[in-house]
Every structure is written in structure tokens, then in C-alpha cells.
Amino acid sequence: MSTPLDHSIRNPISSAEVPPELSENIILTSLDDIYNWARISSIYPLMYGTACCFIEFAAMIASRFDMERFGMFPRASPRQADLIILAGTLTMQMAVPTRRLYDQMPEPKYVIAMGACMITGGMFSADSPTALRGADKLLPIDVYIPGCPPRPEAILDAVTKLRKKIANESPQERQNLQQTHRFYSIAHQMRPAPPLHTGKYLLSETRQQPPQALAEVMGMNIPAFQSPEQQELLLQSGQQRELISREVDEAYKSSSKMY
């Protein structure tokens, strides 16, 4: 049985035309893009702050900045959060609890360091025996927000940069892109130190009566700064400070055993 010949070309040289009703209903993408699109639209930050910068983060919850338009809903449990914003000063005493919260967060998880104190130690980096000089010594930081304190607009800009970073990454490659030059772990060998300012310097003999060698160099007698009665009162106050410092040391040692 013969059939009529079909003179239409099945495989034309030119590109095939896609009907408009078909092009408006088909999207070409990959599973990674869909996965990242879902994650950037549902970033759940942890409600965690260590100092004053957290007040600026709390301002984002209000209607003026409205972080919920980014799909950000604050969570009180680290097991329900995938973003931790480190806001404020990180001390040696809070380093271990902060690391414990980070370990309890499910993968993939991200960290934003907010404020000068969290990035470099800030004004506490000069002579503070307890401040941590940068949170990147403890956790892998994804975005840094400089400022003292940063404005809520800067936090939104950091969230936008984090969303771009999430959109361009692959879940298979994230484990290979972890920082390797930091020592962010429990075994960071950082131990709390006893307080340095105990008031014992007030008991020094040369504090009230200059040393004899200084008087010989100057060629004149240097009188004492305090009278004997005042020195006796100062000695009593110094003994009280020493007693208080001992109580503080004992309380400090007992609290450090908890960690």
C-alpha cells in the first residue's frame, strides 16, 4: 500500500523554532541551581550575640529593614539554623560555647563575623588578656562586616553577598573549599589565664617611697608620697584587695572547670 510522500524536511539546517507557548513554560536548569535557589530563599540565622553589635542585628527584625523579605527567620536552636552571625566581642570564656553551637548546626552552614571586635579584637586587641583576636581563629568565616558597630544596611549587604556565594557554589565542592590555614577546632590550645590586675602593685614599697638609687642619680632627696598614716590605710586597703582577688581567682578556677 503506497503512502503519499512527505516533502517536509525532518532535520533542517537552520535551528528549530520554538513556539512561544512552549518557551514560556520551560526552564532549563540543574539540580544544584534548584538546591541553591531554595537555600538562598530560606536562610535561618541563629539568635546569638556576645556584645553590643547584636543590637544592630536585632534592628533588622523590625519593619524598617525587614530581613524576612530575604527569607530569613531567626531561630533559637542551632539545630534549626544554618547561619550564625558573630556579633560583638568573643572572649576566651565564650570561645568553647560558640564552637559548640557551630558544631550543632547542620550542614551546610555559614558564619558572618560582624564588627571590629569580632574580626580583629578591636579596641580589646591591645592589652586584653581575655579577648580573642579574630573569630577566624575559631570558626571558618564566610563574610566579614567591618565597623564599630556596623549599620543594619551593612548587614543586609553582607547577607546579599552570602546569597551570591551560596548561589554559585556546588554542594559537592563545599567540603573542598574549606579554609585550611586556620586552627578553628576544639584543640586550639587556647586556655583562660588568671587576671593580671589584682591590686598587688599597691603593696610595692617603691610605690610610696622612691628607691634610693633614683635619689642618688637625681642628687637630691625625694620625699615619700604618703604620710605613715596614709601608708597604713593604703596597706589595709591593699590587703583587702588581695583578699578579694583571691576570692575572684577561686571563683574563676571553679567556673573554668565547667568547660
Curated annotation (Swiss-Prot):
Cofactor note: Binds 1 [4Fe-4S] cluster.
One Gene Ontology cellular component: respiratory chain complex I
Co-factor(s): [4Fe-4S] cluster
Catalytic activity annotation: a plastoquinone + NADH + (n+1) H(+)(in) = a plastoquinol + NAD(+) + n H(+)(out); a plastoquinone + NADPH + (n+1) H(+)(in) = a plastoquinol + NADP(+) + n H(+)(out)
EC number: 7.1.1.-
First-level EC class: translocase
Keywords: 4Fe-4S, Iron, Iron-sulfur, Membrane, Metal-binding, NAD, NADP, Plastoquinone, Quinone, Thylakoid, Translocase, Transport
Location(s), subcellular: Cellular thylakoid membrane
Keyword Transport among record annotations: yes
Membrane-protein topology: Peripheral membrane protein
HAMAP family attached to this UniProt entry: NDH1_NuoB
Subunit relationships: NDH-1 can be composed of about 15 different subunits; different subcomplexes with different compositions have been identified which probably have different functions.
PANTHER family membership: NADH DEHYDROGENASE (PTHR11995), NADH DEHYDROGENASE [UBIQUINONE] IRON-SULFUR PROTEIN 7, MITOCHONDRIAL (PTHR11995:SF14)
Family statement drawn from the similarity comment of this UniProt entry: Belongs to the complex I 20 kDa subunit family.
Protein's name in the database: NAD(P)H-quinone oxidoreductase subunit K 2
Highest classification ranks of the organism: Bacteria, Bacillati, Cyanobacteriota, Cyanophyceae, Gomontiellales
